[in-house]
UniProtKB/Swiss-Prot annotation:
The keyword Signal does not apply. Its main location: cytoplasm. This is Enolase. Gene3D superfamilies: Enolase-like C-terminal domain (3.20.20.120), Enolase-like, N-terminal domain (3.30.390.10). Keywords: Cytoplasm, Glycolysis, Lyase, Magnesium, Metal-binding, Secreted. It catalyses: (2R)-2-phosphoglycerate = phosphoenolpyruvate + H2O. GO terms for molecular function: magnesium ion binding; phosphopyruvate hydratase activity. It comes from Helicobacter acinonychis (strain Sheeba). One of its GO terms (cellular component) is extracellular region. Pathway: Carbohydrate degradation; glycolysis; pyruvate from D-glyceraldehyde 3-phosphate: step 4/5. Its EC number is 4.2.1.11. InterPro entries: Enolase, Enolase-like_C_sf, Enolase-like_N, Enolase_C, Enolase_CS, Enolase_N.
Length: 426
């Protein structure tokens, strides 16, 4: 029986220069694998706890030595000797060791690092690719990338309220062709921004962070870039938004669009979205309303839920019980999947299975604070999520995921690129 022989954690750096955890697991056959945990900039209030040291003398309080110590002591001592390939049992032990609903004691960064490293080590020991180990024989589908090519909100220091303007290359036969087209649009966009004397500095996720007069201008210039690059707007490449509206809302559920000097209630904001969807080929809006504005979400879902994808990120925080509440209330029709919002691979799997059972789309996602770790690329293929958000075609921590997906596509001898089939349901 393959068992856990040793576990240890190290404080390393993420793509924003902040500390994070690298966890390593060694199995009884001496197979070793590691995983690096990502970290978010805009976070949902119901996310599992990311344990930080709060020692202002180190990394401005953002150190993770306490979380590393938890891995190197409590977690290590309680997991050594357990069967490695029983991921659900080990993850259950991690949850029980912590004893809180949100990993407030050990830290979700500690638990997830170990959970990821264990899955990777087990796959390696069995001489299987990670996507095959996690997904079995049905792991065949390459996801549609949602590439964040203009950054605003908390991901950039500019005047744009919406956090992400994305492109979705739906009209292609393969992942590699979809990615090539996206890269060409990205480079064409840079030239257009240069011509407009706009900044082409990039945000946390590799998208450009120019200053526009309002939140519509980015849609215009991206549309121009798609067509100038030689692609059909809406048919081959569609648009998507992540509004991250929990960052815009006040205690009265009014939404402050500072870039446009507007304050809108939920109904007015939904009307604004409807105008944008009517004018531009927007196929997905993420976090269109605040995580606490469930009444507003119900209205948004009623008004646009049959027309486009409505993704809950801060709304659901990859949590099966919160998703279940949304399902009962007919809120949203898709969920963003971020393993570090929930704490272990097994809990992430539970949420994905629940979503799929109720015909909610799943979008595998990175965080703004990333690393060279490409786990989510394998995870997206393993669970056939159909979509992946992992930044633009810039910054090596984003490219690592795309390169891994290209590698998987090659291993699968093409696999299945879901493309336009993504939204052909219901």
């Amino acid at each position: 029986m393959l068992t856990i022989k040793d576990i240890h954690a190290l404080e390393v750096m993420d793509s924003r220069g902040n500390p994070t955890i690298q966890a390593s697991v060694i199995l009884s056959d001496n197979t070793k694998a590691s995983a690096i945990v990502s970290s978010g900039a805009s976070t949902g209030k119901r996310e599992a706890l990311e344990l930080r040291d709060n020692d202002k003398t180190r990394f401005l309080g953002k150190g993770v030595l306490r979380a590393c110590e938890n891995v190197n002591t409590v977690i290590k001592h309680n997991l050594i000797g357990l069967e490695a390939i029983n991921q659900a049992f080990v993850d259950g032990r991690l949850k029980a060791l912590d004893g809180t609903p949100n990993y407030a004691n050990l830290g979700a960064n500690a638990s997830l690092g170990v959970s990821m490293a264990l899955a990777r080590a087990s796959a390696k020991a069995l001489n299987m690719p990670l996507y095959r180990y996690l997904g079995g024989a049905n792991a065949l589908t390459l996801p549609v990338p949602m590439l964040n090519i203009i950054n605003g909100g908390s991901h950039a220091n500019n005047s744009i309220d919406f956090q992400e303007y994305m492109i979705m290359p739906l009209g292609f036969e393969s992942f590699k062709e979809a990615l090539r087209a996206s890269a060409e649009v990205y480079h064409t966009l840079k030239k257009l921004l240069d011509e407009k004397n706009q900044l082409t500095s990039v945000g946390d996720e590799g998208g450009f962070a120019p200053n526009f007069k309002n939140n519509v201008e980015p849609l215009e210039v991206i549309s121009q870039a798609i067509e100038k690059a030689g692609y059909k707007l809406g048919e081959e490449i569609a648009l998507a938004l992540d509004v991250a509206s929990s960052e815009l809302v006040d205690e009265h559920f009014n939404y402050h669009l500072k870039g446009e000097n507007k304050i809108l209630n939920a109904q007015e904001l939904v009307a604004y979205y409807k105008e944008l969807v009517a004018k531009y080929p927007i196929v997905s809006i993420e976090d269109g309303l605040s995580e606490d504005d469930w009444e507003g979400w119900a209205f948004l879902s009623k008004e646009l839920g049959r027309q486009i994808q409505l993704v809950g990120d801060d709304l659901f925080v990859t949590n099966a019980s919160i998703l279940q509440k949304g399902i009962k209330k007919n809120i949203a029709n898709a969920i963003l999947i971020k393993p570090n919002q929930i704490g272990t691979i097994s809990e992430t799997l539970e949420t994905i299975r629940l979503a799929k059972h109720h015909a909610y789309q799943c979008v595998m996602s990175h965080r703004s604070g990333e690393s060279e770790d490409s786990f989510i690329a394998d995870f997206a293929v393993a669970l056939n999520t159909g979509e992946i958000k992992t930044g633009s075609t810039a910054r090596s921590e984003r490219i690592a995921k795309y390169n891994r997906l290209l590698e998987i596509e090659h291993e699968l001898k093409g696999g299945i690129y879901i493309g336009k089939e993504l939204f052909k349901h219901g």
